[in-house]
UniProtKB/Swiss-Prot annotation:
This is Indole-3-glycerol phosphate synthase. Its EC number is 4.1.1.48. It comes from Bacillus anthracis. The gene is trpC. One of its GO terms (biological process) is L-tryptophan biosynthetic process. Belongs to the TrpC family.
Length: 253
């Protein structure tokens, strides 16, 4: 059967093959915006997320322009956009739309397995690329991280357990993302942030917490663990008051 992650990666291989047949990367360079700079103070990376394998449809018909504008007005330090179509109902068009609306750093949230996806994200306006350790071999991770640097972009290298963390640390990346969600089962455990955060604090690396953050209490918990930011999707996409969520994030620890 394979895990959810296996299914997603298999789908990505098909998409990459199709991209090589239909897409020619542009050579033009452009200015990019820095997440590292945004993380100088505690930052919310606010996500545009229409659906997910674990929750099904979340906010399928979201107005991307309006959502991104609200995020920026409320004080988001960056915006994350799901570009996976099959499992998350996103698209590169959503990323492009967000870029047209937003002046803050943009993260392309996808399952990146090939350089051509990075080219596509760059053209659509991404400043930051998510690289998921669980989805890549060590060699491929290193190759894609180098390519991110070559393009003048930043990377969030995502980990879920100790083994993945050690692989990520070897890269000395811009930012490490601790995903509280196990991508093999899609179960969430916020204690992963506390567990892995200790090691990252020792290494003095910049890191954020991702997934399962829904309340002021969750924000306090990850801040105490040493996170410099949070990536929040579902809670914001279903919130009746996005402004209140951002106010809760300003709590001092």
């Amino acid at each position: 059967m394979g895990t959810i992650l296996d299914k997603i990666v298999n789908q990505k291989k098909k998409e990459v093959a199709a991209l090589y047949e239909t897409y020619t990367p542009v050579k033009e360079k452009r200015k990019t915006r820095s997440l590292v700079k945004a993380l100088e103070q505690f930052t919310v990376i606010a996500e545009v997320k229409r659906a997910s394998p674990s929750k099904g449809d979340i906010n399928l018909h979201v107005d991307v322009r309006k959502q991104v504008k609200t995020y920026e007005e409320c004080g988001a330090g960056a915006v994350s956009v799901l570009t996976d179509g099959q499992f998350f109902k996103g698209s590169f068009y959503d990323l492009q739309t967000a870029r047209e609306e937003s002046s803050i750093p943009l993260l392309c949230k996808d399952f990146i397995i090939d350089k051509i996806q990075i080219d596509r994200a760059y053209e659509a306006g991404a400043d930051i690329i998510l690289l998921i350790v669980a989805a890549l071999t060590k060699e491929k991770l290193k190759e894609l991280y180098s390519y991110v640097l070559e393009k003048g972009l930043e990377a969030i290298v995502e980990v879920h357990d100790e083994q993945e963390l050690e692989i990520a640390i070897q890269l000395n990346p811009h930012v490490i993302g601790i995903n509280n969600r196990n991508l093999k089962t899609f179960e969430v455990d916020l204690s992963q942030t506390e567990k892995l955060g200790k090691r990252l604090n020792e290494e003095k690396l910049l890191w954020i917490s991702e997934s399962g953050i829904h309340s002021k209490e969750d924000i306090i918990r990850v801040k105490r663990a040493g996170a410099k930011g949070v990536l929040v999707g579902e809670a914001l996409m279903t919130s009746s008051s996005i402004h209140t969520f951002f106010e809760d994030c300003k709590v001092n620890i």
